[in-house]
């Protein structure tokens, strides 16, 4: 069984918006609608779990799932941090073989990216899409002076969905929970415990909508791509 966990817990602080970013309107529908639709329409995905803050569950059911006829398998309460939300969802997936973990604020994930996530997770147990940074990346010191310039061809900006053998990611999450280790994404979870992640070619259109500038780009994409 292949399962997808969609994380929709962003509060939209960088948007300057009181409304959670996954519910922001994008050409007549909330951002989360487009994200869920991509996974619902994918033939490789057997089960979908959506994670939202406890106090938004009723709103999400009413204004997203029911309003747009989106069928998922479970709606799970998120935690205070991203890794807690992932852990809560993993606990609902006892019989999965592969699990994909995706940001709800990435509505332009393609079917190709999802398919590759499943394929490479089966082959390598851990995989994620990534793109080369377009800008030169430097390391700076505490006084804001440059210290070093990194080799751009060796760098990659990791996207989602990040895909894993279920037992691997679940056991790794249990271990970092026990050790009280904080991480920013799920590839870091398995890497901290000695497992390599296969990185395949991502898509520059697979943006995470985080800032007002991202929303401008998203509005263009939804009118010209979706």
From Swiss-Prot:
Marked site positions, Positions MEP for the nucleophilic attack: 152, 208
GO biological process, one term: isopentenyl diphosphate biosynthetic process, methylerythritol 4-phosphate pathway
Listed GO MF terms: 2-C-methyl-D-erythritol 4-phosphate cytidylyltransferase activity
Enzyme Commission code(s) on record: 2.7.7.60
Pathway participation: Isoprenoid biosynthesis; isopentenyl diphosphate biosynthesis via DXP pathway; isopentenyl diphosphate from 1-deoxy-D-xylulose 5-phosphate: step 2/6
SUPFAM superfamilies, per database record: Nucleotide-diphospho-sugar transferases
A Pfam family per the record: IspD
Top class in the EC scheme: transferase
UniProt-annotated site: Transition state stabilizer, residues: 14, 21
Catalyzed reactions per annotation: 2-C-methyl-D-erythritol 4-phosphate + CTP + H(+) = 4-CDP-2-C-methyl-D-erythritol + diphosphate
Keywords carried by this UniProt record: Isoprene biosynthesis, Nucleotidyltransferase, Transferase
UniProt keyword Nucleotidyltransferase present: yes
Function per UniProt: Catalyzes the formation of 4-diphosphocytidyl-2-C-methyl-D-erythritol from CTP and 2-C-methyl-D-erythritol 4-phosphate (MEP).
Family the UniProt entry places it in: Belongs to the IspD/TarI cytidylyltransferase family. IspD subfamily.
Protein name: 2-C-methyl-D-erythritol 4-phosphate cytidylyltransferase
């Amino acid at each position: 069984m292949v399962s997808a966990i969609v994380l929709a817990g962003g509060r939209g602080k960088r948007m300057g918006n009181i409304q959670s970013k996954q519910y922001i309107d994008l050409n007549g529908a909330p951002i989360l609608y487009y994200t869920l639709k991509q996974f619902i329409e994918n033939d490789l995905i057997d089960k979908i779990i959506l994670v939202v803050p406890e106090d938004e569950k009723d709103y999400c059911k009413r204004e997203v799932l029911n309003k747009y006829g989106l069928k998922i398998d479970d709606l799970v309460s998120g935690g205070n941090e991203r890794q807690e939300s992932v852990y809560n969802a993993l606990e609902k997936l006892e019989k999965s073989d592969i699990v994909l973990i995706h940001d709800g604020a990435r509505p332009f994930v393609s079917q190709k990216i999802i398919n590759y996530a499943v394929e490479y997770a089966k082959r390598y147990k851990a995989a994620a899409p990534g793109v080369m940074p377009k800008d030169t990346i430097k390391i700076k010191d505490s006084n804001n002076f440059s210290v070093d310039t990194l080799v751009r061809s060796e760098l990659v900006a990791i996207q989602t969905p990040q895909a894993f053998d279920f037992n691997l990611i679940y056991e790794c999450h249990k271990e970092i929970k026990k050790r009280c280790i904080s991480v920013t994404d799920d590839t870091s979870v398995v890497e901290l415990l000695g497992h390599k992640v296969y990185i395949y070619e991502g898509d520059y259109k697979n943006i995470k909508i985080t800032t007002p500038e991202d929303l401008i780009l998203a509005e263009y994409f939804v009118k010209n791509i979706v």
